[in-house]
Amino acid sequence: MKYILSISCFVLSGLGLYAQPQIKIAKLKYGGGGDWYAAKTALPNLIAFCNRELGTNIAPEEDIVEAGSKDIFLYPYVFMTGHGNVVFTPSEAQNLRNYLISGGFLHIDDNYGMDKYIRPELKKIFPELELIELPFDHPIYHQKFKFPNGLPKIHEHDGKPPQGFGLIYEGRLVLFYSYETDLGNGWEDQRIHNDPEAKRQEALRMGANIISYCFTLAF
């Protein structure tokens, strides 16, 4: 199945991205017992930020899409998060592979605790690929907002630096994995984590860069 949304619906101008018609993005529902539903206010806040700062026309609420659903092909950007176990069935892994090689983009944000579970599951999707750390000069860090040192550190857990990993298929970044940063928590309502506003803005700006990259460069 070919990806049914075309990047041609996005018009670039000096002011940003203008989308016609309205585009929807989604959160991935997966099996294994992990809390795929975490960070409930994150995407609506990121969407509002992107619509305001980038001029996108993204629907204000995200959809929920299951890993094995053909509806995943409706979304140019799918977000995945959680703290725990992740399991993809063979058919789900094949569906995700088809989605990604057909033009889709998956952003995985480790909400702390997912890393040891997600890495073997990604091998089910792309057994031939390895996660690679993206260099700081990668375009995903240099959209409207500049991050010369890569991902910002939003929440501290064990003192490790934030890292951005990717899967690259035939020269195209199809999956971005943000690790040791907690971007999604930074997108949430301020009252939830009591993050300083400066940290929230860092997280939202980096999230906007990911959306911008997905919409304009990844296809």
Residue ranges and their predicted role:
Residues K24, K29-G33, A39-A42, D115-R191, ...:
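An acidic, glycine-rich "communication" segment
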